[in-house]
Every structure is written in C-alpha cells, then in structure tokens.
C-alpha cells in the first residue's frame, strides 16, 4: 500500500481525494485502490483561509492524523498530494519532499509561472523522483 500525505486544505479536493482513497462516503465504483492518505497538514491559504477549519474536521472524521508542519510528514509517506489553490506556493510546498526523493502530485494550478514549473521539474529530476499534475477541466466544453 502506498502511503500518501496531503498538504494544504483549502480545496474540496482534499476531502474528495481522501474519501476515494480510503473507500469512505463514496460509491464503490469511485474507490481508488493501492494507496491511502496516512497523514495531512492543513497549511494556510491567502485565497480561502475560511475553508480550512471545515476541511480539517472532515479529514479528522476520516481518521487521518494531522501534523502542524509539512516536514513532519517526511518519513511517514511514500508520496505527496500538494493541494493548495495557490499555484504560486507550489514550488516551496513541494521542495522539501522532492529534495527527499518523494514523488509529488501538484493540484491545479500547477504553478503561476513557467520559471517555477521548470524549477519543480528540475528538483524532481535532480532527486530522481516524479512530479505530475492533472485537471479534468480540459474535457469541459467551456
């Protein structure tokens, strides 16, 4: 089982991803096997700070322990989900994990600049790990 950490609780993706990985509160056809969220860190948010307390409570109800600092997850995880809605913080949020060779999924927006994106990929390459992002919005008609 792949142990995942989750960082920055300012988006509904935090709960949606956790429920699917933990097989809780969603239909069986939405379950995702092979990995579980084993620890989280709420982080902070300039965009949506008011959302964090509710998501912290939802994550706690799913049985996921919460740590105070992102670095506390190192050694407890095999991969990271960087969830902040603030693309401008993703480089610094991913850096400690990438430097330890921990693969990172970075939610949209991946970054707010080409320079940050290049730095993230360079960190991943230098530490022989993987980084990726994805968005279902590419398939929407608008």
Language-model features: where?
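N-terminal glycine-/serine-/threonine-rich beta1-alpha1-beta2 phosphate-ribose binding loop
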Residues: 1-100, 118-127
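Conserved Rossmann-like nucleotide-binding pocket used by diverse enzymes
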Residues: 5, 105-106
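Short, glycine/acidic-enriched loop or turn micro-motifs at the edges of active sites
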Residues: 11, 110-111
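Hydrophobic residues in well-ordered beta-strands that form the structural core
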Residues: 68, 106, 131-133
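Long amphipathic alpha-helical scaffold regions
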Residues: 100-102, 134
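Short helix/strand-capping hinge loops at secondary-structure junctions
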Residues: 101, 108-109
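A contiguous active-site-proximal alpha/beta segment in oxidoreductase catalytic domains
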Residues: 111-142
């Amino acid at each position: 089982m792949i142990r995942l950490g989750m960082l920055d609780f300012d988006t509904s993706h935090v709960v949606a991803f956790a429920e699917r990985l933990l097989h809780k509160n969603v239909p069986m056809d939405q379950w995702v096997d092979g990995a579980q969220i084993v620890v989280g860190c709420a982080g902070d948010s300039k965009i949506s700070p008011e959302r964090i307390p509710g998501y912290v409570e939802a994550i706690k109800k799913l049985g996921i322990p919460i740590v105070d600092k992102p670095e506390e997850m190192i050694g407890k995880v095999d991969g990271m989900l960087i969830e902040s809605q603030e693309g401008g913080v993703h480089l610094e949020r991913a850096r400690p994990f990438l430097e330890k060779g921990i693969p990172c999924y970075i939610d949209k927006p991946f970054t707010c600049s080409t320079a940050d994106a290049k730095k993230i990929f360079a960190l991943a390459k230098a530490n022989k790990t993987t980084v990726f992002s994805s968005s279902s919005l590419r398939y929407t008609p608008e």
